[in-house]
A protein has these predicted regions:
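Short S/T/G/P-rich N-terminal loop/turn motif that feeds into the first structured element of a domain
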Residues: 1-76, 81-93
Protein backbone atom coordinates (compact mmCIF):
# COMPACT_ATOMS: atom_id res chain seq x y z
CA UNK A 1 0.00 0.00 0.00
CA UNK A 2 1.32 3.43 -0.93
CA UNK A 3 1.42 6.10 1.75
CA UNK A 4 0.35 9.52 0.47
CA UNK A 5 3.10 12.14 0.28
CA UNK A 6 2.37 14.79 2.90
CA UNK A 7 5.48 16.83 2.20
CA UNK A 8 5.15 19.85 -0.05
CA UNK A 9 7.92 20.43 -2.56
CA UNK A 10 9.35 23.56 -4.10
CA UNK A 11 10.94 23.41 -7.53
CA UNK A 12 13.00 26.30 -8.89
CA UNK A 13 14.29 26.13 -12.47
CA UNK A 14 16.57 28.73 -14.00
CA UNK A 15 19.63 29.36 -16.12
CA UNK A 16 22.81 30.71 -14.55
CA UNK A 17 25.81 32.52 -15.99
CA UNK A 18 28.31 30.22 -14.28
CA UNK A 19 27.36 27.14 -12.28
CA UNK A 20 30.34 27.31 -9.91
CA UNK A 21 29.58 30.92 -8.95
CA UNK A 22 25.86 30.13 -8.63
CA UNK A 23 26.51 27.07 -6.45
CA UNK A 24 28.60 29.10 -4.01
CA UNK A 25 25.75 31.61 -3.72
CA UNK A 26 23.17 28.84 -3.31
CA UNK A 27 25.18 27.19 -0.53
CA UNK A 28 25.71 30.53 1.24
CA UNK A 29 21.92 31.10 1.31
CA UNK A 30 21.17 27.92 3.33
CA UNK A 31 20.26 29.79 6.53
CA UNK A 32 17.69 31.88 4.69
CA UNK A 33 16.06 28.78 3.16
CA UNK A 34 15.94 26.98 6.50
CA UNK A 35 14.35 29.98 8.22
CA UNK A 36 11.55 29.73 5.64
CA UNK A 37 11.03 26.02 6.37
CA UNK A 38 12.75 24.94 3.14
CA UNK A 39 15.07 21.96 3.55
CA UNK A 40 16.67 19.01 1.77
CA UNK A 41 17.66 20.88 -1.38
CA UNK A 42 18.71 18.71 -4.30
CA UNK A 43 20.39 20.38 -7.26
CA UNK A 44 20.16 18.96 -10.77
CA UNK A 45 21.87 20.17 -13.94
CA UNK A 46 20.86 19.67 -17.54
CA UNK A 47 23.25 17.13 -19.08
CA UNK A 48 23.42 19.18 -22.28
CA UNK A 49 23.68 22.59 -20.58
CA UNK A 50 25.37 22.58 -17.15
CA UNK A 51 24.22 26.18 -16.55
CA UNK A 52 20.56 25.07 -16.70
CA UNK A 53 19.70 24.28 -13.07
CA UNK A 54 16.74 22.72 -11.27
CA UNK A 55 16.51 22.78 -7.46
CA UNK A 56 14.01 20.49 -5.70
CA UNK A 57 13.42 21.22 -1.99
CA UNK A 58 11.11 20.07 0.80
CA UNK A 59 8.76 22.63 2.33
CA UNK A 60 7.67 22.42 5.96
CA UNK A 61 5.54 25.59 5.98
CA UNK A 62 4.02 26.57 2.64
CA UNK A 63 2.97 30.06 3.77
CA UNK A 64 6.50 30.90 4.94
CA UNK A 65 8.00 29.42 1.78
CA UNK A 66 5.67 31.44 -0.46
CA UNK A 67 6.66 34.62 1.38
CA UNK A 68 10.33 33.68 0.97
CA UNK A 69 10.12 33.04 -2.79
CA UNK A 70 8.57 36.50 -3.24
CA UNK A 71 11.15 38.20 -1.01
CA UNK A 72 13.74 40.79 -1.97
CA UNK A 73 16.25 38.61 -0.10
CA UNK A 74 15.84 35.78 -2.61
CA UNK A 75 15.73 38.11 -5.61
CA UNK A 76 18.95 39.78 -4.48
CA UNK A 77 20.68 36.45 -3.79
CA UNK A 78 19.70 35.11 -7.22
CA UNK A 79 20.94 38.26 -8.92
CA UNK A 80 24.29 38.12 -7.08
CA UNK A 81 24.67 34.42 -7.92
CA UNK A 82 24.19 35.08 -11.63
CA UNK A 83 20.70 33.77 -12.34
CA UNK A 84 19.75 34.67 -15.91
CA UNK A 85 16.17 35.81 -16.54
CA UNK A 86 13.19 34.93 -14.39
CA UNK A 87 13.12 31.57 -12.62
CA UNK A 88 10.21 29.15 -12.89
CA UNK A 89 8.99 28.49 -9.33
CA UNK A 90 6.42 25.80 -8.52
CA UNK A 91 4.96 24.25 -5.38
CA UNK A 92 3.75 20.64 -5.56
CA UNK A 93 2.50 18.00 -3.16
Amino acid sequence: MNTPNTTENLTIHHKVQDYTKWRAGYDAHETSRRSAGITNGRVFRNAEDPNDVIVLQDVGDVAKARTWVASEDLKSAMQKAGVVGSPTIRFAA
